[in-house]
């Protein structure tokens, strides 16, 4: 097995992979104004501005493109899993503050002409800019971190830095992950969380793990896998498969450490 590179070299490779991926993803704007991202950003904005989960005013603002919705009584709701909308809250709050106080005043009238032909106006333009920011803070960031995580996972398993870097680059730039990383959908974030859960299990489920360390590792894996399902409900089967792998890998661990790992995973998954 080839010798692993020194810690400094690993950090440099990690930063190079992360920055290359994040800058590449941020250069593109994919799906903004479409039904899927619109449904997600509407929930984020409703939580921030209205302290509500209803999306009525956004349905009224985008009647032609707001297709991903459910109606209960007199109100409309996003029909998407809420996870990615919740994760985007801090970035959208900050982005909206900068948009209102910095970007929009400098752009002047141009700030109201950024939306598609079907939804021109200041408010649609603001929504489209915030959708792009939300995508950067979730899909793009999660995928860039996933690229780095895969590099470290492959490096630990093989000891081959070149092979690990190739695998990470292939994931980030030569698979559909690139496309999903440029859109405010749930796909990329859910995939990155599944990969995180898998990496924690593979790297941390060791016979020499202390009970406390196993508990923290289980908590991290549970949070990642549960988060993936909260972002995209169809991620549940994949999360269950990864969870089954975790149980299988617990066989070689001492009973107290295995019990703590399971308890942490259950707590994290339910959180």
Q: Where do the model's predicted regions map?
A:
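Perimembrane helix-loop-helix junctions
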Residues: 2, 200-211, 237-267
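Transmembrane-helix signature of polytopic, membrane-embedded enzymes
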Residues: 11-16, 102-126, 145-173, 191-192, ...
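Membrane-interface alpha helices of multi-pass inner-membrane proteins
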Residues: 22, 44, 167-172, 200, ...
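Interfacial juxtamembrane loops and adjacent helix segments
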Residues: 49-137
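Membrane-embedded glycan-lipid processing machinery
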Residues: 80, 130-141, 166, 170, ...
């Amino acid at each position: 097995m080839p010798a692993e590179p020194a810690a400094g070299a690993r950090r440099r490779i990690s930063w190079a992979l992360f920055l290359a991926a994040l800058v590449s993803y941020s250069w593109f704007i994919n799906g903004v104004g479409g039904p899927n991202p619109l449904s997600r950003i509407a929930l984020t904005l409703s939580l921030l501005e209205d302290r509500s989960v209803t999306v009525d005013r956004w349905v009224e603002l985008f009647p032609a493109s707001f297709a991903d919705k459910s109606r209960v009584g007199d109100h409309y709701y996003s029909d998407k899993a809420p996870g990615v909308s919740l994760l985007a809250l801090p970035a959208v709050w900050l982005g909206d503050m900068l948009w209102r106080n910095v970007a929009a005043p400098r752009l002047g009238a141009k700030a109201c002409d950024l939306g598609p032909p079907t939804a021109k106006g200041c408010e649609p333009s603001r929504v489209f800019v915030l959708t792009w920011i939300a995508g950067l803070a979730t899909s793009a960031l999660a995928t860039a971190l996933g690229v780095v995580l895969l590099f470290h996972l492959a490096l630990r398993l093989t000891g081959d830095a070149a092979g690990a870097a190739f695998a990470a680059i292939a994931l980030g730039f030569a698979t559909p992950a690139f496309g999903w990383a440029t859109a405010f959908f749930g796909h990329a974030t859910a995939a990155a969380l599944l990969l995180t859960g898998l990496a924690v299990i593979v790297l941390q489920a060791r016979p020499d793990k202390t009970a406390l360390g196993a508990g923290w590792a289980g908590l991290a894996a549970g949070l990642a896998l549960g988060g993936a399902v909260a972002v995209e409900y169809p991620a549940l089967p994949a999360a269950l498969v990864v969870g089954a792998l975790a149980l299988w890998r617990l066989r070689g661990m001492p009973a107290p450490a295995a019990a703590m790992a399971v308890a942490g995973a259950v707590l994290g998954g339910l959180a």
